[in-house]
């Protein structure tokens, strides 16, 4: 029935594309007029468009003419003319949607259309790529086009100083990686002077390989952290201990969720070994944390699959691309546990200073768009999480690639023998072959087998990152054999060499199905670009992880019943259905996991947005006296509310405790006594305290002079930053154990939201209390500067680290003044009283 409806009415994607084709015809009609313009006249169109926008004209009204101008400029500068389908891709981006365009269809050129149009607004367009190589390449090549049209182009790279970054962001168009844009946002919210900020308000971002950035990387938050000096000996002790534990008896592994849990026997062994009564007692949180991390490191994380050891350090391998993520570390003590497992020097744990998920970072843009060759399978996620529709753009020429059915073998060894035999036969003809593997270990295993057969080849995995683009670009030449880990080299076109088309084009071999159909489609999509011939074939075994995790037993039993030899493959719809069913289940599970990460981060995000806005307001305002006084009043009101509760009669109030709280917290010592407060109503007490606060605050202003304004700013920044860091850490710890609430029939997310809100309110109160005490009691140094503001947290501010999908920050630091000791304050107050008596 659905097929009949589609035949009669066409699907929604087809209807949208047809509608856009009509608009392309209007753009094409402008071509002769635009072509007749001189270079200067073409360039002047940019100023004309800007003027029209300034006068209130909408972007959509100038789209046709602007796209025609970009197309003509591209012909003159780059020698490339946008195809009609590329114009449609540009329209989709302009509408804030995702253009799905097959490999080789020219996504980089498509982006120039929407980038130019939106850059005319003068608010800055960010073009986001998956790595710095692509950002540099695209900004260099496409920058010539934009410069010709009178627009400026910046490159935002890791390692630039703040001034260079400000220049890059001030440009009309800025290229960079998702990580660098996200880390700059976090660093901007750690600066001590508004002039140190580098980003403008987030206007429009076009994300290349949008599925990789918004989906594959979505579960990994961006984190800026500093090392906290704690003992590392316990990591070695726990690593040695967990080697004695036995699977099933002492611990269980959930391969689908990748978690490990101690059994009752395992818990007993820990308690006996460490001579404690209850591992889950709050006094043993640290030990529990270390044991869990050591067990995860021992049984869930494999060397040369999840990480490699290089020059005495554990380097994470990106599970999606196979690239080494130098500088990135696992959090929550896991990285230290792996270092202990490998017998390396354990580096100290880090404390999170700032963090955000890519999901919440990119959702802050006023408008968002993306491009990729594979998005349709994840359309639901793009829509629900980011509000992004996916539009599949037709190819310029029909796809000629032939995708053969999967070949399934009983064992992994038989599968690899078949792969090698296929490579040898095709290599004899000179047909280029690209082999996709899912791990460094598998790529090196295959490489050894090919060496034994005398087949020359290139291995492209995380260990050859520098040569990545060069190797991929040459994968289509006569006789080339390239082994690539996952989708390494993504973003680089594979063009066929001379005579290769006659041999059948590039042949793709997949050695294992990925848990996501999208990744499999990406591998296939490397062949058959722009109407070229090509082919693909996946070789599977019943021992592959996906098959093993999701019930290969039935198929294995069938193969045994048929008496099949180890080297004899089967092509079966049953197998294909089983694989696709497994992939859909994993995709659904991964979507739920990413959605879960976002739901929890949304709690932090609401708090983060408020804190960062308040912090920005602090930086931008010169006079914070009202802010400071309101914080002191809030502390005062809480003290009165606590010690003079409405439900008690005044005779039962603890007036001495209230006097102590006032004198120690926000007034000079001995200002208030319980005797003074006796017989007063709560409102009268508040009035008295407020009058004293106002009087003493005015005295502070007179004593300190003009520098009190800077002093207030330093104190408030220090309080906000230090308490926010503590809050991030506390929220992370809450999150780690919140799932246990499910055992008590409570919804963990609701519990996290409720407790997170209470903790946030507690953080705000702590900020107010610290500000009140410092402003009313601290000694102000003569050379007051905003430095060392976040010192005192046990953090080495000179060695900050970033993690997420990689790189590192270099935030500025700032300072505070210490309060006088009790004796000094008392002496000062007595002197003040003597002076008052004289007057």
Swiss-Prot record:
This protein's record includes keyword Cell membrane: yes
Family matches, as Gene3D superfamilies: Helical scaffold and wing domains of SecA, P-loop containing nucleotide triphosphate hydrolases, SecA, preprotein cross-linking domain
UniProt subunit comment: Monomer and homodimer. Part of the essential Sec protein translocation apparatus which comprises SecA, SecYEG and auxiliary proteins SecDF. Other proteins may also be involved.
Name of protein: Protein translocase subunit SecA
GO biological process, any: protein import
Binding-site residues for ATP, renumbered to this chain: 86, 104-108, 493
Disulfide bonds: none
Function: Part of the Sec protein translocase complex. Interacts with the SecYEG preprotein conducting channel. Has a central role in coupling the hydrolysis of ATP to the transfer of proteins into and across the cell membrane, serving as an ATP-driven molecular motor driving the stepwise translocation of polypeptide chains across the membrane.
Membrane topology, from the record: Peripheral membrane protein
CDD domains: DEXDc_SecA, SF2_C_secA
Origin species: Brevibacillus brevis (strain 47 / JCM 6285 / NBRC 100599)
Catalysed conversion reaction: ATP + H2O + cellular proteinSide 1 = ADP + phosphate + cellular proteinSide 2
InterPro entries documented for this protein: Helicase_ATP-bd, Helicase_C-like, P-loop_NTPase, SecA, SecA_CS, SecA_DEAD, SecA_motor_DEAD, SecA_preprotein_X-link_dom
Region (Disordered): 794-839
Entry keywords, A to Z: ATP-binding, Cell membrane, Cytoplasm, Membrane, Nucleotide-binding, Protein transport, Translocase, Translocation, Transport
Membership in a protein family: Belongs to the SecA family.
Molecular function per GO: ATP binding; protein-exporting ATPase activity
Gene Ontology cellular-component annotations: cell envelope Sec protein transport complex; cytosol; plasma membrane
Start-end of Basic and acidic residues biased regions: 807-833
PROSITE patterns cross-referenced by the UniProt entry: SECA, SECA_MOTOR_DEAD
Family annotation (Pfam families): P-loop_SecA (PF21090), SecA_DEAD (PF07517), SecA_PP_bind (PF01043), SecA_SW (PF07516)
